[in-house]
UniProtKB/Swiss-Prot annotation:
This is Phenylalanine--tRNA ligase alpha subunit. Pfam families: Phe_tRNA-synt_N, tRNA-synt_2d. Its EC number is 6.1.1.20. It is found in: Cytoplasm.
Amino acid sequence: MENTIRSLQQEIIDFEITTAADLEAFRLRYTVRKGLIAALFGQLKTVEPAEKPRMGQLLNQLKQTADAKLTEAEERLAGTESKSSSNRIDLTLPGRRYFTGSEHPVQKVLGEMKSIFSAMGFGIATGPELETDQYNFDLLNFPPDHPARDMQDTFFVTSGNPGSDVLLRTHTSPVQIRVMLDQKPPIRVICPGKVYRNEAISSRSYCVFHQLEGLYIDKKVSFADLKATIYSFAKQMFGTDVKLRFRPSFFPFTEPSAEVDVTCYLCGGKGCKVCKKSGWLEIMGCGMVHPNVMRNCGIDPEEWSGYAFGMGVDRTVLLRYKIDDIRLLFENDLRMLKQFTA
């Protein structure tokens, strides 16, 4: 029996417990009431009386060895389980919503505008946002002392000789000048981009905004062609039931000139603070390209004619989505921008 006890003790010492399954197997084999150790205790009655005390002592040592190993393994595995649990994802917790980004409403509407005019045959031209006085004013029929310059409050960057002042462009019309200087007619382009004006910030105006201008030069182009283009654009942009009105206006670079209005989207024409109680909102200016502008770009106005138009993209965004404050488009308020997430 002594050999059996010593062999079993060595077996217990060598038993590797690394998992909960190993622990349970050890317990069932050695320490339960029907385990190997309990079975040996049951065999003590068959041992010679003189050997019983010594065999009993060996069995007690065997049981202590097994119990100690079992306790140590339980504590070790419990610590490992606790550490593992602290890093484990609790699947019962409510999920966290991750918001995906989306296209800004200004860029979305600008993309639609580009698509509409591209379908009409217009190309796309861009130019620098930092311009000279010559491109921004002089070549567009704004003489240095002409009062029309007061219509566009300008951010000047540097000031030098007349015509060479560097400024932030007040419209994308300088891009049209560059196109007319670089290309020969016929010309059909749109010019999207950011523009800057030193204006008071309000619900209807901002110091920086997005503009899209168009230019078409060919032979025998008329004001009727201009109206047809604008009506076609408006119906695709605002819906087939859109109402427009043309008002006579003045721009140094077009003659005749007009402004185009649509019915106020908030009040339906009844009058509100957004439309200044008029019931109408201006969406663009337009007109026939002034002969002086053509001459400045080396184009003969006796042979060629054309029209131009320009609109605020941000104003169109307000119309499309019924937003009553243009400042919301520039403040990066996620509460507003998340509404445009697809």
